[in-house]
Amino acid sequence: MTKHVYLDYAATTFTHPKVVEAMLPYFTESFGNPSSIYSFSDRNRTAIRKSREQVARVLDCSPDEIFFTSSGTEADNWALQGVAWANEKKGKRIITTKIEHHAVLHTGQFLAERGFDVVYLDVDAEGRISLEDLKQAMTK
């Protein structure tokens, strides 16, 4: 029997059996678009609302502050672009590192092509940045 070692947990992880069990009805029976107006979607719309409320309780915030995305890439892209465009008048500098996930690096490149000044800091062998480099990047 061959044993496998999976080392890319940054990309995806094992799904806990309880999560699979909870989600199974939405993959097999109730798969309607929760944003649509037809009744087939009511169960899904209710499930998403309740999920948002549960997460908000855990995080002690409003359900209106909870957003679900389909992936880490989508979340990275959305967060970085959202902050960049919302704060564009305050400054167009974005500081990150050269070892970020490609979703971050590609979004940085996208924003640079649209006039943002994206600074990529080096890291040491442990993945740490130099605070002096950060300070310089912040004051340029």
Where are these regions (language model features)?
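Pyridoxal 5′-phosphate
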Residues: M1-K140
